[in-house]
Amino acid sequence: RVADFYTIAIEHTSSGHPAVYDIPLYFLFGVWNLPTYLLYKFADYDYLNATPAQLWLKTMMLVFVLLAARILMRIARTMGMDADRAKWVAFYFLSAMSVVLPVFVIVQYDIVLVAVMLLGLHAYMKGNQRGFLLWFMLANTLKLFAVFVFIPLVLLKEKRLRRVAGQAVVGLAGLAFCRLLY
């Protein structure tokens, strides 16, 4: 019934908003929420109305925002900043209202994409082509916004059309797989 995922999501939505992202993000949610599911299954735990379960879900956003801050520190170090200055980069990121409001107040899942894109950008800056392509292959499946970062980065570094096409195929393969699956 994997092929019926979106149909099932529409039929059984509890919030009025059915599944709108590609399947990798929901896989991540499933892995993260496995402890609450096990409590629900074996201990009759009402996870939809339980504050600890809601806080557990919000903790996922905290983990990804801290991961993004850590990656920004690494990017700053790659750019030649000393360790103290790199910490300021993370501080400014974590204190920005464009981070605090969406991540901690609204609980938007875009921070997952941001963290994965930053991993890809860091690999790009270090010259790790394989890492860059693999991170962006994942990022492109999380949200299409990543494509608008991925394509210019490929074109910035590579000018030979065959290699551009090859890298585009690799970077967009995950997205194509998700679209073909559903």
Language-model region placement:
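TM-lumen/periplasm interface segments of multi-pass membrane proteins
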Residues: 1-83
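Membrane-embedded alpha-helical segments of multi-pass membrane proteins
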Residues: 59-67, 111-119, 139-146, 168, ...
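Specific aromatic-rich, kink-prone transmembrane helix
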Residues: 71, 112-131
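Transmembrane and membrane-interface helices of multi-pass
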Residues: 76-79, 86-100
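Membrane-interface alpha helices of multi-pass inner-membrane proteins
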Residues: 100-101, 117-120, 130-154, 177
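Short acidic/glycine- and proline-prone juxtamembrane loop motifs at membrane-interface regions
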Residues: 104-112
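Perimembrane helix-loop-helix junctions
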Residues: 148-173
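Transmembrane-lumen/periplasm boundary regions of multi-pass, lipid-linked membrane glycan transferases
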Residues: 172-182
